[in-house]
UniProtKB/Swiss-Prot annotation:
Residues reported in the UniProt entry to bind substrate: 10, 42, 74, 88
GO biological process terms on file: coenzyme A biosynthetic process
Organism name: Aliivibrio fischeri (strain ATCC 700601 / ES114) (Vibrio fischeri)
Residues the record marks as site: Transition state stabilizer: 18
Residues the entry annotates as binding ATP: 10-11, 18, 89-91, 99, 124-130
Keyword Chaperone: no
Name of the gene this protein is made from: coaD
Protein name: Phosphopantetheine adenylyltransferase
């Protein structure tokens, strides 16, 4: 059975930690859709289209990875795509508690969707898009935390907001 795996997130912006999980997932599963969420309840720095383009740019060399934006419930997107696996990253016990609650809800809404949790590589365990955005918006360097094309996009976005 072919496994279609979703890796959902806001990716505002995509970080080296996200990319690490995508690459590791791509080596374990047949097909990965990086599902970039519209997340209207979050005030994002980048638009949905910009985030999709940034993720596409940094995953273009991964032949079994596809990138799509979506709005609405993740489980509805999973049903539409006929996904049967969901990959989520866990950095901390707080992430675990949050993800455990989400997974319980997903099971009620779509019992056939299994969740797989991956822990980050050690060098990315502290990393989050929120931290990257905050550092970038305050003029700090984030080049060690994001792919170079994302770093440039952040610089451009911050410069245009001044």
């Amino acid at each position: 059975m072919t496994k279609l795996t979703l890796y959902p997130g806001t990716f505002d912006p995509i970080t080296n930690g996200h990319l690490d999980l995508i690459k590791r997932s791509a080596s374990m599963f047949d097909h990965i859709i990086v599902a970039v969420a519209a997340s209207p309840s979050k005030k994002t720095l980048f638009t949905l289209d910009e985030r999709v383009q940034l993720v596409q740019a940094v995953t273009k060399d991964l032949p079994n990875v596809y990138v799509e934006g979506f709005s609405g419930l993740m489980v509805d997107f999973a049903k539409e795509k006929k996904a049967n696996l969901l990959v989520r990253g866990l950095r901390t016990t707080m992430d675990f508690e949050y993800e455990f609650g989400l997974t319980s809800m997903y099971r009620k809404l779509m019992p056939e969707l299994e969740s797989v949790f991956l822990t980050p590589s050690e060098e990315y365990a502290f990393l989050s898009s929120t931290i990257v955005r905050e550092v970038a918006l305050h003029g700090g360097s984030v080049e060690a935390f994001v792919p170079s094309s994302v770093n440039q996009a952040l610089k451009n976005k911050v410069a245009s907001s001044l």
